[in-house]
Amino acid sequence: MALRLEDKKAIVAEVNEAAKGALSAVAADSRGVTVGAMTGLRKKAREAGVYVRVVRNTLARRAVEGTAFECLAETFTGPTLIAFSNEHPGAAARLLKDFAKEQANFEVKGAAFEGNFIPAADIDRLAKLPTYEEALAQLMMTMKEASAGKFVRTLAALRDQKQEAA
């Protein structure tokens, strides 16, 4: 069934709004994936704060025009699933990378982050970005280790000072 012009404009506007509020985007080929698997992917995406939509290529190109994800337009060939991360930059990449491991027919085409295109082979860089909570925990660990090291150096200096006095 062909889409009416109003429907196409609504799809472009919806995807464009998602793109404007997103931190990163991932494009994938979902050809050959069962409806049940796609439903599961959409459920996981909602839980992870990821907007997922299968869009016609021409509509997807128009939707990302003028956004940081315009570099993805070259990947819009064949059936295209586009996922936008709203809460964490690596969420969509991590979600689709894990889904591709489960589904042999699912293929990630590429990603975009801060206006830069990331090829499918390098998607791990984006997927391995720590979440806000993980980054905060790493920072706290670093600060904690630094203060422990400072305490040890202070004790060593105090010991050296006492040895010199004796």
Swiss-Prot record:
Keywords: Ribonucleoprotein, Ribosomal protein, RNA-binding, rRNA-binding. Gene3D superfamilies: 3.30.70.1730, 6.10.250.2350. One of its GO terms (biological process) is translation. CDD domains: Ribosomal_L10. Belongs to the universal ribosomal protein uL10 family. SUPFAM superfamilies: Ribosomal protein L10-like (SSF160369). This is Large ribosomal subunit protein uL10. Part of the ribosomal stalk of the 50S ribosomal subunit. The N-terminus interacts with L11 and the large rRNA to form the base of the stalk. The C-terminus forms an elongated spine to which L12 dimers bind in a sequential fashion forming a multimeric L10(L12)X complex. It comes from Shewanella oneidensis (strain ATCC 700550 / JCM 31522 / CIP 106686 / LMG 19005 / NCIMB 14063 / MR-1).
